[in-house]
Amino acid sequence: MNRMLGYLKGYERESVLAPLFKMLEATFDLFVPLVMADIVNVGITAHDLHYILVRCGLLLLLAFIGLTCSLTAQYFSAKAAVGYSTALRHALFAHIQSLSFSEMDTLGTSTLITRMTSDVNQVQSGLNLFLRLFLRSPFVVLGAMVMAFTVNARAAMIFVVTIPLLSVVVFGVMVVTRPLYKTVQTRLDRVLGLTRENLTGVRVVRAFDKEQSEIDRFEDANALLTGMQLHVGHLSALMNPLTYVLINLAIVALLYVGSIEINVGGMASGDVIALVNYMNQILVELVKLANLIVQISKALACAGRVQAVLDTKPGMTFPAELLGEVAADKTGDAVRFDHVGLTYAGAGAPSLTDISFTAKKGQTIGVIGGTGSGKSSLVNLIPRFYDATEGSVEIFGRPVASYPRDALRGRVAMVMQKAQLFGGTIRSNLLWGNKDATDADLWAALETAQAADFVRAKPLGLDEPVEQGGRNLSGGQKQRLTIARALVGKPDILILDDSASALDYATDAALRKALAALPGALTVFIVSQRAASLQHADQILVLDDGHLVGIGTHRALRSSCPVYEEIYESQFKKGEAEA
């Protein structure tokens, strides 16, 4: 938690001034019952209207000063809380960006979204309340007791007994409920995860007529959340009635003692009113304190969850400078896998086993295999989205781990299976590949990606708006734009991870022809389910259950690799295959 407090840096002044101004407000509030007692004891008893008006003016002055102090404290506490949450959110987002795919897979997208939004907001609200009330409420409680002694020491002993009892109730409820709020947040994560999963896959749910099944899953998770929230709510709800009972008993005792003191001349009636007002002030502040404790319990639980993400160490480190030298016998290599294995965190079986091959500069490498054979896992190792658990992966004669992050990403461009575009324009999305690219560079990339025609047909061309996720574009258009985005950076290695699946055969063929015609020694990896898309590749890697079962040209594999032959024949008629 000490690290969490570090995000208050720059707001130390506000963090001190906010509670101080609340204490000033409380100080003026503590004088109000004494002024009211004077009005009753002196003004009303003596029928002195002038005295009453003067004291009423004093009450208005105290109220005005208290309001000014309160507004000032609100301003400083809000500024500190918002500044803190902004710094925390920035730090959390930056830390998430530093995590590898492995940590992202472990934590989960919905969990990280919850940490960034709901949890940080809860911490902000808790801090805001804390700065305003953590000194004011105890100060008023203790101050009211001290002021009660200035009125009547015997009656004030009731405060001495009542306040510890109230403290036991308040802090007892806090101790019991705080760990339960952590459970509530965990179950809330589960509900949010199910919601996100369902909304993301809503078309699949409806296609398989699983609406009722999903409703049942959600209701089960929601019932667990509701049950825990009710349990915590019932425990927290005990606080108010218990405190009210104790306060009311204390007021009854005050009235009893006060009546006796008045009869013997030890107190005036105004003094009893002052003592009751002090007791009511204690009640109000303890209710505030109780609510503060509930909010702080939630905020601490959320802060702990945010801290857990911040404590997650990135599984990968990148050097600041390029390391090592290229061996003379590897100068022509673009990518080299040497007995590579990969096992994902938490997975029971390896996804890749003993993979070895070399891709030369300028070659086109096809990757094919059945579903779950490890195709994406293999190409994900090249840009170092994951680290191999066995063996070594090299690009251009050096281990991928020897490249700084920006240098590696500059040389290797990858187009993912799912075409992901961001809200903005076509131009802004393409500039992700190279922020300094000219319009000529953008159009050249679009021509190669077979996207220039449909972009020219748009009313605004490169400045045509793109909705979040590319919702206003077809699947094929999105895929071609993501390919163009990768080409804008002019990489040395281009990886197309089944990223032309939405293209027709003619467009797919034109794309491959355009890639082959690019100047320079661009090495291309094409992951595809279509054997036809890989026929002209210099090498084709055939994967089966994480093993490399075949490597060679299309013609060689048809005669030497049963898995490849089976895939090919399943996509073409027997006569066409033989032709």
Question: Where are the predicted features?
Answer:
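Transmembrane helices of ABC transporter permease
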Residues: 10, 14-27, 38, 68, ...
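ABC-type nucleotide-binding domain
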Residues: 327-579
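Short intracellular "coupling" helices and adjacent cytoplasmic loop segments at the cytosolic face
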Residues: 46-47, 82, 90-114, 118-120, ...
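Hydrophobic alpha-helical transmembrane bundles that constitute the permease/transmembrane domains
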Residues: 19, 23-31, 64-71, 123-126, ...
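An intracellular "coupling" helix at the cytosolic face of ABC transporter transmembrane type-1 domains
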Residues: 10-13, 98-102, 118-131, 135, ...
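Membrane-integrated ABC transporters
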Residues: 1-31, 36, 44-60, 65, ...
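Helix-loop-helix
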Residues: 48-50, 54, 147-161, 231-305, ...
